[in-house]
Amino acid sequence: MGDLKSGFEEVDGVRLGYLIIKGKQMFALSQVFTDLLKNIPRTTVHKRMDHLKVKKHHCDLEELRKLKAINSIAFHAAKCTLISREDVEALYTSCKTERVLKTKRRRVGRALATKAPPPERAAAASPRPGFWKDKHQLWRGLSGAARPLPISAQSQRPGAAAARPAAHLPQIFSKYPGSHYPEIVRSPCKPPLNYETAPLQGNYVAFPSDPAYFRSLLCSKHPAAAAAAAAAAAAAAAAAAAAAYYQVSAAGPQPKAAAGAGGPGSLSYRCKRKRGGAKDCLLAPHAGARRLLLLPRSYKAKAAAAAAAAAAAAAAAAGATCLERFHLVNGFCPPPHHHHHHHHHHHHHHHRAQPPQQSHHPPHHHRPQPHLGSFPESCSSDSESSSYSDHAANDSDFGSSLSSSSNSVSSEEEEEEGEEEEEEEEEEGGSGASDSSEVSSEEEDSSTESDSSSGSSQVSVQSIRFRRTSFCKPPSVQAQANFLYHLASAAAATKPAAFEDAGRLPDLKSSVKAESPAEWNLQSWAPKASPVYCPASLGSCFAEIRNDRVSEITFPHSEISNAVKRTDLTINCLAEGASSPSPKTNNAFPQQRILREARKCLQTTPTTHCADNNTIAARFLNNDSSGAEANSEKYSKILHCPEFATDLPSSQTDPEVNAAGAAATKAENPCTDTGDKTLPFLHNIKIKVEDSSANEEYEPHLFTNKLKCECNDTKGEFYSVTESKEEDALLTTAKEGFACPEKETPSLNPLAQSQGLSCTLGSPKPEDGEYKFGARVRKNYRTLVLGKRPVLQTPPVKPNLKSARSPRPTGKTETNEGTLDDFTVINRRKKVASNVASAVKRPFHFMANFPCPPSLIIGRDGDLWPAYSLNTTKDSQTPHKAHPIWKWQLGGSAIPLPPSHKFRKFNS
């Protein structure tokens, strides 16, 4: 060791020990890794070493001891690799440069892009600027063209901005995408900075910023609307182009008002859209859409926050929040405006459609006053708040859904909702007092819902899930919900027809039917859903509002509310029992999100939801509503099931139709039976609870389609069979908290959904024991003893089942289990394949049991409840055999297992 020289060198503040071997400073690679390059992944370092062709020296025992002596390596190290100083430097430089400079390069690149683009703006030739432009165009479109626009305008067309109608619109609406984009590209260079500094940016949803995309979405569907929107937007943008985003939003209403006052463009379009045609509405909505684009949920959330902050007074705050949503949706919301906007926003709205709208003005004011009552709840006037909230909700949901589903849909829907809202407001103006009262009751829920929703939508579905969990207050709404439910059901019952007639009905039709077809599927269901919301609303003031009135007013409300609900879906569901509409609306956007929200809402509000859900479903089923109505009697028992279906569908992809049908029936039934209604609510909630969410997420489409039939049929059977029991159980559970019913249904629901077959849950297949995986299974001791247990595993996972089953254990047990025949067959099969043999056995279905029904659910009080109780387990719908509840209770099986099963794990 004497000849080994050692020393220490400090590199970048790190003290490394080295040995001098053959005249070279050799550093312990382990120390270089752990100390010098500690923040750099080992794989990166190794790659760099390979790239640099670092020569490694494997130290001998003496060197190893020396390194330990100078504490360069761990005392317990058995070997060490040394690398030379040059290699350490090269490696360090390489790794650090690769990591640090990458970010630096990006920053530099951005800076260069920002600075260089001005010339490039003029030239518009640089590929990089083009890249930035494209990249930022999205931002531009999202945040509103205002900031980027000024930049572009400055750079390229000082006077051209005026020339281009869409110059100030988000690029998506730009008529000159080609020229605009370059500008956008350049402006984005600056705007990115602006956005970074701007609080709005973070919240923005990332829409495809492709102008063509939005334009195609909006313009293709509503060319006239696109033009009108472009004009209106241009005017608004021109006014607010340089203004901050908020101002732009604020400006939106003014231009819109101007358009409304000045010509058909805004007001007419809106009116037409509401009354005359979805297409016309869309025209106006384009402005709305533009605004919507400008008002991604993040802005909305911001607006909501701003509104809340600004609205020191609860009323003002409430109004602001709702307005914020509404404005955001319409692009009207300057955060400050929100308060008075909430009250006046409608006025703006109204002013836009001034003749009809102003009539609302008083009603709106009335509603705002109710808002005064409680900030969040009062926040939204029933219609207004609903619409605003709806819009806001839409925005927030819309933000979410935009990202998940389609921006254009969001925009359009928002527009539609805006229109709808106006429509709703107009109608409200017509039924001022009744509307107001309706608004007040509904507006509480709606505002709360919209507030929570808008916020949550920005957050995430998860947050929504939690929110829905926390929304226990809906139970309080239950009484109202039932009441609303009746009204809603009546409205839904009438509405479905109305909706069917919606095409013929001027107002409702315009909003609902015309918009539905003209706008997207989303919108179609949204309008339908919107009516649903109305019914809930109507529920509050149904006395004042006749069914037709409900149809008309509710419908617009509903539509807007629905939009709101989409976002506020959970809240609304809970608060208003309008979760279904919300989910439906949500459905259009992010189906899964909607599903989740729907199920959340349903889950949260057993009764309330159901009513709204039914109504919503009926409305959503605008087209199917007649059928639904026709079937409503038939579904009276199924009602719960349809409700369930509705919830699930609303949660699911096709909720509109499926949920609509179920909802329609449900709505009608509820109207007929209050008692049943309550149960349906419970059922609905139960089903919709966790199961829907889990299953939807896995296979929302499947569930939607299957659920419609399955829920209806199976649930029909299930509910008819168990209705009396469930009714009692549910009633009792309702008293306990919807949690219990929820629990009960969820077990079934999860199965049904997981299987895509409610029937499996609702009505165990009598042939389960006899047929497995399509093969006839002998009824042996096991089958007799276990009964239809296989049903649980029958879930449609046949392929999975076989693969999931453990062939060996199955085969083994089967030998003991089976009768002689079975045994022989099994032996034969075993030889062929143990998997096949296991088919005869009660196999463990991996996925069938997988989304295990929740054993604990959130109760009304927000606390955890057992998902199943002796109550519910006694019902015909006992928990899934795989459910943990069987592990909690003694005698999980009434019948003892056969000896072969005694020690099996799957006997639960």
From Swiss-Prot:
InterPro entries: DNA-bd_dom_put_sf, ElonginBC-PRC2_ViralRestrict, EPOP, SKI/SNO/DAC, Ski_DNA-bd_sf. It holds the Pfam family Ski_Sno_DHD. Residues 370-389, 396-410, 449-461 have a biased composition (Low complexity). Disulfide bonds: none annotated. Keywords: Isopeptide bond, Ubl conjugation. Residues 411-429 have a biased composition (Acidic residues). Residues 337-461, 744-763, 792-818 are annotated as: Disordered. GO terms for molecular function: DNA-binding transcription factor activity. Residues 337-353 have a biased composition (Basic residues). There is a cross-link at residue 688 (Glycyl lysine isopeptide (Lys-Gly) (interchain with G-Cter in SUMO2)). One of its GO terms (biological process) is regulation of transcription by RNA polymerase II. Belongs to the DACH/dachshund family. PANTHER family: FLJ44216 PROTEIN-RELATED (PTHR23187), SKI_DACH DOMAIN-CONTAINING PROTEIN 1 (PTHR23187:SF2). This is SKI/DACH domain-containing protein 1. It comes from Homo sapiens. The gene is SKIDA1.
